């Protein structure tokens, strides 16, 4: 079998799909994208395609090494996202060629189901509470919320009180019937992160995500030393080499690699194993589309330390398309009591409505995240 063609489709809401074709008619799908930089990743995919045409898609490990090491410069979000989508598509092809789901190629099931969590937006506590109530009605009991708005390097107590008040109201409304993680989104610098985490401890969030940016990862062990709350991070780390440093330094209780940003299934399988050796849990980051989610699920079902799976159904970013709009076999993604179950069709197990993909790709939006500024005009982290 040989790779014959690579096609990319930028799609609403903010996704990009990749199709790899072979001379035997087997097609694989991947999802290479950096939200807000889809065109840049698309260019990288097509540049890398020179290494792919005519190659045997079954040699996934060799292809991965060529894509990563053939260029003198490597790593980073753009290249690793391009590699990620290609890698997903290659696993899809291999599973289809052999007639088995990808999790079987990775050693088989280590669990029968995985708990999913849902992101809940809203600027006011009442909006967040209403969103949680709606999701509990369809079986969710685990959520992720914004931990705060933009916050200065040193900010006032009113900002801290406002962030804590939202969490307090949510905990009062639901008690211990739900669990929720708080995503700081890298908006907080180390001095305020210490204060905010301390103030939030009485409300027992499930985890604190990205209390500071990955560039400030040396603060993760320092922050972890001052709190009993689990610290999570990893969506902005792009290879096992990025994770090697934070795992060795300690501090993280949960890692959150993104299978569309961190080299795909091949790389994240290794990252998960590294984390297990450090007694660190895995909760793959996935606010993206169905191919990314399918890739995450195959990893969840073979990694013993996987504990939670993010998914984007109903997320506020999904303007113009919902998670399963491009999927034919929607029933395979059905959840029971907030849990996903293994995808048992060959390959990634996601059947793409290619006709709809082609049509919707004709007018794909160029999504950009907003640019936030502090009251003094300086740029703030979004």
From Swiss-Prot:
The protein's matches in InterPro entries, at most eight in alphabetical order, are given as:
DgoD-like, Enolase-like_C_sf, Enolase-like_N, Enolase_C-like, Galactonate_deHydtase, Mandel_Rmase/mucon_lact_enz_CS, Mandelate_racemase_C, Mandelate_racemase_N_dom
Q: Which domain of life is it from?
A: Bacteria
Marked site: Transition state stabilizer: 310
Q: Name one GO molecular function term.
A: magnesium ion binding
Pathway where it operates: Carbohydrate acid metabolism; D-galactonate degradation; D-glyceraldehyde 3-phosphate and pyruvate from D-galactonate: step 1/3
**Which parts of the sequence bind Mg(2+)?**
183, 209, 235
Q: Which GO terms describe its biological process?
A: amino acid catabolic process; D-galactonate catabolic process
Which Gene3D superfamilies is this protein grouped with? Enolase-like C-terminal domain, Enolase-like, N-terminal domain
- Database matches in Pfam families: MR_MLE_C, MR_MLE_N
> What EC identifiers does the entry list?
4.2.1.6
Residues in the active site?
Answer: 185, 285
Which co-factors does it depend on?
A: Mg(2+)
> Which positions does the site annotation Increases basicity of active site His cover?
258
Keywords of this entry:
Lyase, Magnesium, Metal-binding
Q: What class of enzyme is it?
A: lyase
UniProt keyword DNA-binding present: no
Q: How is the cofactor bound?
A: Binds 1 Mg(2+) ion per subunit.
Q: Which CDD domains match?
A: D-galactonate_dehydratase (cd03325)
Catalytic activity entry: D-galactonate = 2-dehydro-3-deoxy-D-galactonate + H2O
> In which family does this protein belong, per the annotation?
Belongs to the mandelate racemase/muconate lactonizing enzyme family. GalD subfamily.
Its biological purpose is as follows: Catalyzes the dehydration of D-galactonate to 2-keto-3-deoxy-D-galactonate.
Further facts = Reaction proceeds via an anti dehydration.
Protein's recorded name: D-galactonate dehydratase
* Species the sequence originates in: Pectobacterium atrosepticum (strain SCRI 1043 / ATCC BAA-672)
Q: Which gene encodes it?
A: dgoD
């Amino acid at each position: 079998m040989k790779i014959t063609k690579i096609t990319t489709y930028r799609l609403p809401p903010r996704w990009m799909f990749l199709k790899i074709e072979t001379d035997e008619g087997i097609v694989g799908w991947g999802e290479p994208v950096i939200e807000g930089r889809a065109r840049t990743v698309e260019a990288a995919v097509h540049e890398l395609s020179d290494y792919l045409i005519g190659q045997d898609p079954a040699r996934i490990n060799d292809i991965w090494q060529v894509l990563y090491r053939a260029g003198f410069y490597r790593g980073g979000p753009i290249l690793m996202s391009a590699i990620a989508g290609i890698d997903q598509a290659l696993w899809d092809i291999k599973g289809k060629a052999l007639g088995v789901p990808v999790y079987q190629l990775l050693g088989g099931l280590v669990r029968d189901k995985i708990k999913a969590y849902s992101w809940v937006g809203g600027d006011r506590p009442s909006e967040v509470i209403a969103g949680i109530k709606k999701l509990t009605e369809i079986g969710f009991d685990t959520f992720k919320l914004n931990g705060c708005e933009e916050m200065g390097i040193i900010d006032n107590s009113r900002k801290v009180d406002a962030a804590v008040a939202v969490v307090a109201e949510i905990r009062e409304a639901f008690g211990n019937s739900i669990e929720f993680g708080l995503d700081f989104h890298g908006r907080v610098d180390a001095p305020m992160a210490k204060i905010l985490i301390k103030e939030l401890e009485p409300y027992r969030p499930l985890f604190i995500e990205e209390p500071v940016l990955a560039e400030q990862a040396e603060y993760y062990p320092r922050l972890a030393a001052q709190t009993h709350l689990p610290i999570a991070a990893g969506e902005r780390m792009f290879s096992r080499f990025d994770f090697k440093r934070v795992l060795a330094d300690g501090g993280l209780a949960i890692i959150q690699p993104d299978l569309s940003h961190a080299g795909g299934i091949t790389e994240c399988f290794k990252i998960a194993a590294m984390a297990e050796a450090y007694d660190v849990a895995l909760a793959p980051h996935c606010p993206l589309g169905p191919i990314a989610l399918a890739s995450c699920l195959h990893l969840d079902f073979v990694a013993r330390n996987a504990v939670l799976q993010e998914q984007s159904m109903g997320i506020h970013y999904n303007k113009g398309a919902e998670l399963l709009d491009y999927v034919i076999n929607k029933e395979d993604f059905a959840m029971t009591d907030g849990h996903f179950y293994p995808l048992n069709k060959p390959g990634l197990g996601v059947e793409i409505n290619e006709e709809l993909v082609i049509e919707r790709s004709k007018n794909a939006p160029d999504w950009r995240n907003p640019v936030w500024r502090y009251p003094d005009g300086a740029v703030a982290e979004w």
